[in-house]
């Protein structure tokens, strides 16, 4: 038993999106009921009417549309919530019961996503400061240590205690002015004796009392009221109410289950966890701990420790939002109770679902944590669902977050990945859950460890999950320490973590050992082989770039993987997995049917989206295979069956591959032969030189599906029409349209082609004078519509794969004012080309600079050309040596025809084991194939390579290997852009920016300096006027260019006039003057009218260059 375990030290991975699912399940089973019950009963202001929600009996009705249908119709996949409510009239004793509709609740799909208005969205997990009490020490300006304690609730007022240099204890309520701590304690009704009995060092608190003098309870309450409500006459009753509502009213103040747990743990109290408000005992204990700190008893807290930060997942975020909605609902119900007649009231007339619906809609539609799902490939989808963000409501902001929050903390070990985080302003604020981490009932992150007894790892015992707090006082060894077959730790010294420090100890001292070497990193990072040989910065880029890999036409799994590819693909939900044992009875491109055999697991009795399940033997299960769906990122989602008719399948077997998967394993890129060598400067600065084979054989070809949409609206002048009759368009442009004016499926379209013909009625004002004259004379309506068709934008082309028509008659829900919506999907095959971005898994990214014919590529001794040439200088300074190991082991695998799975951190099998295994496999490849050139032990990893153009060998042997390279989603087709004329900004009249706006290239401040430095005055002048915002000048210039005349002299830029107007609007009399020389030789100061260019501009006094003709040139000679 143990020896088997030794061969397989890897611990089984948990379900990777369980964090989303279990959280939403908690919301449905507990969270929602908890909220409904906390608002029940609602009484009116007189107290004679009561409305009770019977929360635990709430019902969800069947969703209106299925997941697929909701996506197609642009609607939300949601269920209706009904709650039984009871209206009690205390005067008459009437009881009315009714089931009341309280709103739509979006449902989570089985893949952990939500479908909101037809788009798949993900709710990101938020990591926030846990409620509880925190102690911190500060050094004041005199160099004396002072301590402070903050009591932070889940919701409600903060309470902060602090000591000062005179040894007095102060308290602040909700960040207001300082108040003596004695006032608060006395106001709570505690006597001096009670206070002193609770303190370990009462003599310290005595100073505060001596300084302030004694307070009675009444005086204390008055003082409290004065401080919190300055300017109002203080009363004892007012003070009492103020205190009660601030800290002891469960509606206003809530520690939450977590807050109570943390408080009890820190202050060693035993208050039951149903008490969610403060007690006087809590406050006393907090003050006691604070005073003890002055005597060096106790410890201060580290805010960034994961024991003090907790995760709020979907369920809790949604619960908070429901609370907001119910708060608004409660107010409305109260008002209606007061206003309406008590006899005719029914629960249904009282409860208005709108506020709750609005709150939920707002959360899913516009919360910072509800994000459009990143669907580029399965890994991106998986990572997005496991993301942890410190931003969002109740979290941090980018500007406020310092370095400490962003930093890697020792408690992140096995909980948050230290590597995967964005580059840029969000670095460290957005992280990713580590592979084995899970969230416990309080929202703290836990990670599993194996127990160790007397230096022997107990593989026979279940792994223990521990939070960061529990793990602090234990000696924990990492997952890659060597053990023998009996589980004994090998070696005299073992590296361990103990109380946030990394140190070494003897094997006997170790308490626990991590379950797996990849436990500390996230899913994306654990897909990088030889991760331990890469610099962390490059591993970060590698993790982030794998998520940007485009799904290719023919996916190919890596020759060198890490063993997590299969689980990653399965949990992303992209592959179809058999739910039972059985026989395949039918397979085609769109469905797979399996006849069940054997016993069904009891849990699968529930029906899910994909095929209905009931546990009868011999029953068939249908699995739908999706074909060529468009993803959120315009990539193509396509599944293809892997099984044949008549095949036996077992539960959990992969039935169909999704995009970017092959054989049920993640396959983001392609294995290609790489040479590390410079080639004519084409791989300078990370550029990449590739072979034409990658283009011809469609190795890096991907399919992209673009969606174009147009709606025919109701306008003031009449409805817009979707039609084939478009004014001023020849029959040639219409040949692909059907009789309705919509493009037919299968048509090839290019930029500027009409996809949907649409005409808009135009009013009188839109017509030129000659048109008006004609209509006045002949009284005929020269067809008064203008062409408003949907055309293919610039730079796009492809084949129409789908057309969808939505009209009111068919019962589709359309946006207000629209009569009809047409959606056209255009697919394009994009081969790899110059300007596309490629990357490996080790952060080695580059842009393709040239595509060489196959015959010109450097070739190997057996005549086979390499596929890609990378710059060797990209390796040493970046310290991502993992790519070299990967490409050499890949070369061995390529030669032997095998694939390798290498778990990261393989040094547990001995020193330099990565190098040993690579050399060993290369040697094996050479011996098995009998080709001596494959591996030369004297110059390991290098091979003599020949120049494809001349056939000469290159000067030196070159590192050759097979690397796994990805094509990233940053494609040149989406970025390349040019503008001749186009739209201008309204105020400044300068061209807009960006490809989407058909914008121009910004000629910024520094570029202006460059031209100034060269004295290129005329070039600069036309850049700042004619080419930008001199309105009249640019029209004249265009006219001149068209007619072949000289370009006239530029006028005044519009932005200068805007500046003038702005200064004038401040009341400054500012004007432009110029000096004119008069006929008699005297000069005169003339004000320039900047609005004069509305009149015809006078031609400038300057030599005009008529366009030179050939004759005049001949004359000169």
Curated annotation (Swiss-Prot):
It catalyses: RNA(n) + a ribonucleoside 5'-triphosphate = RNA(n+1) + diphosphate. GO terms for biological process: DNA-templated transcription. Transmembrane segments: none annotated. Its EC number is 2.7.7.6. One of its GO terms (cellular component) is DNA-directed RNA polymerase complex. Residues 1108-1117 have a biased composition (Basic and acidic residues). Keywords: DNA-directed RNA polymerase, Nucleotidyltransferase, Transcription, Transferase. It is an enzyme of class 2 (transferase). The keyword Transferase applies. SUPFAM superfamilies: beta and beta-prime subunits of DNA dependent RNA-polymerase (SSF64484). Pfam families: RNA_pol_Rpb2_1, RNA_pol_Rpb2_2, RNA_pol_Rpb2_3, RNA_pol_Rpb2_45, RNA_pol_Rpb2_6, RNA_pol_Rpb2_7. GO terms for molecular function: DNA binding; DNA-directed RNA polymerase activity; ribonucleoside binding. Residues 1094-1117 are annotated as: Disordered. Gene3D superfamilies: 2.40.50.100, 2.40.50.150, 3.90.1100.10, DNA-directed RNA polymerase, beta subunit, external 1 domain, DNA-directed RNA polymerase, subunit 2, domain 6, RNA polymerase alpha subunit dimerisation domain, RNA polymerase Rpb2, domain 2. The keyword NADP does not apply. DNA-dependent RNA polymerase catalyzes the transcription of DNA into RNA using the four ribonucleoside triphosphates as substrates. Belongs to the RNA polymerase beta chain family. In cyanobacteria the RNAP catalytic core is composed of 2 alpha, 1 beta, 1 beta', 1 gamma and 1 omega subunit. When a sigma factor is associated with the core the holoenzyme is formed, which can initiate transcription. NCBIfam families: PRK00405.1, rpoB. This is DNA-directed RNA polymerase subunit beta. The gene is rpoB.
